[in-house]
């Protein structure tokens, strides 16, 4: 399932700014509205705990992937402002609910000693799938000359095929600890909540501001954006597992201090950059720091009551999106 997400989301994200500008005639105002709408399902991620009354977490994850894939598949068919808003919301519901459940299941199933390394491997698998996606996008636009619609359909369709495979090949994983089916907010988790809030702010700068900066200010094409994403994914594939191992050695505190110190430097540089090459370098460095967020998850795994994990994963995503 880790490999299924980038097939849709990387397709959607890579094409978004160019599709919005070239087909739906978006300006910065519409992009801002779209990104706000995209974050609403993330803001409501706490509600995933109520689905546990009806579905198992594994089932929720698969249904979420179906929504993610469907939203991506049909995006190119609706090249209007309202159409792009609607398909984005569908895609976003699937993406955010899947990510919430993926975090929950990972922290429940993985041993604490091996969690950083395995989470790094999960990132690496997703990065590999992203590389394949970026290569397909580059071939589709630069060599074959396809339009946005079939490329969106290929990305979403590939995710649906993986979901079908998962349903057949992995019908059931046992539940180790029964999870709470109500919202959990505990005072002793305050530092985790604070880190989650900061993580949401940095994510918005990367996804919303930096990506649009590349297209609007520096005129990056679909192919050029794909190359940037390709570089980011290659670095993750090569180093995410090693970063996970390193976090297991140096500890979560040292990793998080290094991450946020580096991000301060990158964000200040964003404010003054006027060179397309320098901006691209900052974009790559910015993305590289995402792998260090493993430390935040494993920190919570160490301090949490095991029965709190599912509910807390939803609450954390909501806090992340408040910022």
Region spans (language model):
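C-terminal membrane-cytosol helix-exit motif in multi-pass small-molecule transporters
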Residues: 137-141, 156-175
